[in-house]
């Protein structure tokens, strides 16, 4: 599911070179950063222009359901801006991808928030995800990700940062208590050379059970370190309802 979000995003935000087909300058605007309307082969730009290219504040619209509004530098999305894309895939599902944050050279780069929501033709929301933190070259680098889906378990959580990665699959609510009790559906924890993992399912061998219990004990002992991240997971989970 997480790979699907990344693939969806990369396909959604890729843009061909901005080669203007026609430029109409707004009367009264300065020549250096004139306000203008520019028609492209695949869309329309309205905003500040310099040397015939979007430069400054503006909005680039490909269709009613696909647009970017924010900063441009020499024809590329750079600075702060919001990207919105809603489309129907071959399976009939509606995908809505929104990124609000920093850009550089037409790519997500810097601090931002990415959301991805998928809805069936019946109106049923089958997945809703939010990813927040630092991005670079259209790739999420660090921060928090929460996904809510029609699945079992229905939530997945991930934190990446400061050399630590925490991944949890389970249900939302009382995450810290579940962490302390060692009864989360699945946990993966890595910090440097330390890696701990356990599933809720029974193990098959005595050695596997021993390793599982060792992981649970270790994770219980670092509950205070995990607590801020678990609280952030629960906070973000409120933003991804299946409705």
Language-model features: locations:
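Glycine/tyrosine- and acidic-biased, solvent-exposed loop/turn segments at the edges of beta-strands
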Residues: 21-243
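Sec-dependent N-terminal signal peptides of Gram-positive bacterial secreted proteins and lipoproteins
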Residues: 4-20
């Amino acid at each position: 599911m997480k790979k699907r979000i990344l693939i969806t995003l990369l396909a959604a935000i890729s843009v061909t070179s901005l080669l203007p087909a026609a430029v109409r300058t707004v009367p009264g605007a300065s020549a250096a950063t004139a306000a203008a309307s520019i028609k492209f082969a695949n869309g329309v730009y309205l905003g500040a222009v310099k040397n015939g290219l979007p430069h400054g504040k503006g909005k680039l619209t490909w269709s009613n359901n696909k647009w970017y509004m924010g900063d441009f530098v020499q024809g590329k999305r750079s600075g702060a801006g919001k990207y919105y894309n809603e489309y129907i895939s071959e399976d009939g599902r509606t995908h809505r991808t929104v990124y609000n944050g920093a850009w550089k050279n037409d790519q997500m780069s810097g601090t931002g928030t990415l959301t991805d929501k998928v809805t069936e033709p019946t109106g049923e929301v089958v997945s809703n995800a939010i990813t927040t933190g630092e991005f670079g070259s259209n790739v999420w680098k660090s921060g928090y990700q929460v996904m809510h889906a029609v699945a079992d378990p229905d939530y997945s959580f991930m934190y990446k940062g400061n050399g630590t990665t925490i991944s949890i699959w389970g249900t939302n609510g009382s995450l810290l208590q579940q962490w302390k009790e060692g009864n989360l559906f699945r946990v993966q924890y890595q910090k440097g050379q330390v890696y701990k993992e356990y599933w809720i399912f029974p193990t098959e061998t005595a050695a596997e059970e021993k390793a599982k219990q060792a992981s649970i004990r270790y994770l219980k002992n670092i509950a205070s370190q995990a607590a801020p991240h678990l609280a952030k997971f629960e906070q973000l989970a409120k933003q991804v309802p299946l409705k």
